[in-house]
Amino acid sequence: MFARTFTVVVAVLCLVGTTAFAQPQSAEPSSVILFENVRIFDGKSDTLSGSMNVLVRGNTIDRISKDPIPTDRSANTKIIAGGGRTLMPGLIDMHWHTMLVRPTVAALLAGDIGYLNLMAGAEATDTLMRGFTTVRDMGGPAFGLKRAIDEGTIPGPRIYPSGAIITVTSGHGDFRQPFEVPRVLGAPQSRGEQTGAAMVADSPDEVRVRVREQLLLGATQVKLTAGGGVASPHSPLDASTFTEAELRAAVEAAENWGTYVAVHAYTPISIQRAIAAGVKCIEHGHLMDEQTAKLIAEKGIWLSTQAFPDEMADAFPPGSLERAKAFEVFAGTDRTFALAKKYRIKTAFGTDILFSPRLAPRQGELLAKLVRWYTPAETLAMATGTNAELLALSGKRNPYLGKLGVIEHGALADVLLVDGDPIANIKLIEDPAKNFVVIMKDGKIFKNTL
């Protein structure tokens, strides 16, 4: 229902105009695009290249050369004079909630579905215009929006959807009200379940069903909540939710489809139990201890974590339990990144912006905050080449054939032309409207101010 509703309302919007969305130019369908005289950040290196030329043919990078690249200079060829600017891969946010960025919790649980979809569509366009050409959606009904973007109905980033967050009764993501308890098998689903935001599962068998449902709908990976969370009113941070057997059931179901499970987890016990069950990626980890960090490193588990700003707590009322939990998590940020660096944990960058249209425009700023722990080059590499490595864990469930996060021959042409050197001045990414002069996704130009 969510996907059908979204398709209808977006089609109507296209008929009456698109003033509700940010205003990228129409994607230019040139079959050959040549960037001349650019310095390249390739998504891996510590420094920029010298002056180079990059040829994009169709949706892939066809040639990179320090020598001039000849073209037929026909109407199908577009030449972009780089003027020594930086060409870099499009940014990747590994913990995004496409449908949950702008609405309040109350609007999500009680608002009109068509309205929520239109808000998400507008935010998707703005996300692309901030230079984030790919997001990994870590919970919510993003399948319809992904389809609309992929079909060209609306501009937006590539989406790797997880589908509904899978939780337990009383777990993070169970937004039922007290009058909705007890949960009766066969009874109508809660509002959160009806929208596809979250699904409750209370046994290994139920977990298998819920995981398989999300895979049927098109999930590229699956997310479970292994412990308590900030936004859920009945889920204390110290709580461990799924049993190891339940988590293992999810892992087996996902592996049968050639993909992996990521879990929301803050505490040592939640993280350790998930790793024992075969989970491949920990989301957050802000309250982990040194022993747990060692285990993550030894097992080669991914840590997808965030440098939360204090303003993120503004989504919750002053004096609320949720707000208090938020600051408890924020206090662990510095230690989390320090442990990740100390033990060389495979670390991915994401923002996890929720219920805050004011914070969403600061997506690049949250990336730039990582220079507190990493060099600018390491920070940019994390948000491009490193994040793309984690995306590749989805295996054959990967919806986008080709390599992301790098500037190299054969890679998908998701690139940004930056007016300056972001390694020397990473704050350039905080103002994409000014400093990202070209935004290209899948070989199509969505912004060109040159």
Predicted feature descriptions by range:
Residues 6-18:
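Bacterial N-terminal signal peptides
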Residues 20-29:
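Boundary at the C-terminal end of the N-terminal hydrophobic targeting segment
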Residues 26, 40, 44-88:
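Histidine-rich, glycine-flanked metal-binding segment
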Residues 38, 54, 59, 84, ...:
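Divalent metal-coordination and catalytic microenvironments
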Residues 85-151, 169-178, 183, 245, ...:
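Metal-associated gating/positioning segment near the N- to mid-region
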Residues 105-118, 189-209, 260-262:
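Active-site mouth loops of central-metabolism enzymes
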Residues 162, 169, 224-335, 346-348, ...:
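Active-site core of metal-dependent hydrolases
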Residues 256, 330-422:
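His/Asp/Glu-enriched, well-ordered alpha-helical/loop segment
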